[in-house]
């Protein structure tokens, strides 16, 4: 993607996260980026403490704010050591400099290259913000999440489902 993106900020949407929102999640992140004069912005939502080991979890300057500067991010931490309950969902607006950090990432949690590791290594030089987006997120990477999304959107379109 780097040759296509060039020197422009860009959005990333992970396919297993489906969002129903009053305005697009990427649009919300872009608006926050513009309001702050630049920087990367990552969508987050609060999760139950026992669920932190299923997500990338961020640490921020102020957990009470809708948008706050990130200070750290860890992939799937044990609930006992999670820095917050703010979980990353699959929506991002990045500055192009993030590619420089992603190119240096090695295999991480689960034997995979983790986007989280690239973000973590960029935090000292690329201003990065966590934003609690407005809307509902469905994890369509799980059977239950896919079913929940299907029922939600069917009901929203007027289908009667018990």
Label each region the model flagged.
Residues 1-60, 94-96, 102-105:
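Conserved beta-loop-beta/alpha segment of the NTase-like Rossmann-fold superfamily
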Residues 11, 30, 34-35, 62-161:
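Catalytic-core segments of class I nucleotidyltransferases/pyrophosphorylases
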